[in-house]
Design a protein with these regions (language model features):
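Short, structured coil segments at secondary-structure junctions
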Residues: 21, 54, 96-97
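Alpha-helical oligomerization interface recognition
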Residues: 62-132, 136-138, 142
Length: 214
């Protein structure tokens, strides 16, 4: 199946690598290059580094609604778009592929919708979390669920360790999901069917959030 992959950090690279081994990645979308550090040197995203190393078609739009970028995506004629740790997509983008656009999220949705699901699972003292694949819709992290995988949060596990574990578990889950979609075997569950009580939230982490009340 032809796939366009969208992602930025190291977390996304494991998924791109896994997908590239079993499906045709016809395009990779990542953030535009930015200057960073004291020397203000250009730094590539981890996903860009992987795309270059593996000779994959690379796109780095400044604006996702740019007409030229949208047309290039359409010309790639991908069956499916896959999103891992990227920006919120406008409908004009996620509506392009015939089989839809899916996202990998680092929680067991509908819990921990938002930007920092791993952090909040640790902060709240959860003993389990996981990853979810779902179809992207207008509202962020609310689309129909396709697959989930659960992972234990051990007593002394930190966010970095949880990140690394979910990075690979999530990549395997994503390939499983793509295979199901390719074979016409994907069965979805609306998130509304899973909400029985107040759901946990995962807003962006700020400095104030990190203050400890001794």
């Amino acid at each position: 199946m032809k796939v366009v992959f969208m992602g930025t950090p190291e977390f996304a690279v494991a998924s791109l690598d896994a997908i590239n081994k079993v499906h045709e990645v016809v395009g990779v979308v990542t953030v535009a290059d930015k200057k960073a550090g004291r020397g203000k040197k250009i730094r590539y995203s981890a996903v860009k580094d992987f795309a270059i190393e593996n000779n994959l078609t690379l796109l780095q739009p400044e604006k996702l609604k740019n007409e030229e970028f949208v047309n290039v995506l359409k010309e790639l004629n991908a069956d499916l778009f896959v999103v891992v740790a990227f920006r919120m997509l406008p409908e004009v983008i996620w509506n392009i592929p015939s089989k839809g656009t899916i996202n990998l999220h680092g929680s067991l949705l509908p819990d921990y919708r938002g930007a920092a699901p791993l952090n909040w699972a640790i902060i709240n003292g959860d003993t389990t979390t996981g990853a979810t694949t779902f179809f992207i819709e207008k509202e962020i992290d609310t689309g129909n669920i396709i697959d989930q995988v659960e992972i234990e949060i051990t007593e002394n596990m930190n966010v970095g360790e949880l990140h690394d574990s979910l990075m690979f578990k999530g990549a395997d889950l994503l390939v499983q999901t793509i295979n199901k979609i390719d074979q016409g075997k994907a069965i979805v569950t609306p998130q509304a069917e899973l909400i029985t009580d107040r759901i946990k939230e995962a807003p962006k982490i700020f400095k104030d959030t990190c203050q400890i009340d001794w």
